[in-house]
Amino acid sequence: MTKTFSAKPADVTHEWFVIDATDKVLGRVASEVALRLRGKHKAIYTPHVDTGDFIVIINAAQLRVTGAKPIDKVYYRHSGYPGGITATNFRDMQAKHPGRALEKAVKGMLPKGPLGYAMIKKLKVYGGAEHPHTAQQPKVLEL
């Protein structure tokens, strides 16, 4: 009788990957990144163990969306006070905080709870081409 394999946290190795997001579509990048942060691309994937890799995304300022979404896609946040809701569209979000739209998209695709919060911490997003993770020797990942 064979038993189902269950990965142990000590046995999992987390690799580093770098993705160039220049002229890539937001949703397609986000879904691939979420899959790799969870570790579903690995044979040792276990739902309750963090088996995912570290992902560094560069050039997030050049990320794009299709159609009329630069103006029509709206992000909401609320201060907690009555009437304290603010809305920002994708174009303004990219101009002010490049990469935040990608972070929000990926975060929505990850599980909610302690494991999901640990997974989102492995995502590093930078608007430009430079990143401070060269010491980890990230491998280039083509999407």
UniProtKB/Swiss-Prot annotation:
Which UniProt keywords are present, listed alphabetically?
Answer: Ribonucleoprotein, Ribosomal protein
Q: Which GO terms describe its cellular component?
A: cytosolic large ribosomal subunit
- One biological-process term from Gene Ontology? translation
Question: What cystine linkages occur within this chain?
Answer: none
Gene Ontology molecular functions = mRNA binding; structural constituent of ribosome
Q: Which Pfam families match?
A: Ribosomal_L13
Q: Does the keyword Ribosomal protein apply?
A: yes
Q: Which NCBIfam families match?
A: rplM_bact
Q: What does this protein do?
A: This protein is one of the early assembly proteins of the 50S ribosomal subunit, although it is not seen to bind rRNA by itself. It is important during the early stages of 50S assembly.
Q: How does it assemble?
A: Part of the 50S ribosomal subunit.
Q: Which family does it belong to?
A: Belongs to the universal ribosomal protein uL13 family.
Annotated protein name in UniProt = Large ribosomal subunit protein uL13
- Organism of origin is Variovorax paradoxus (strain S110)
Gene symbol here is rplM
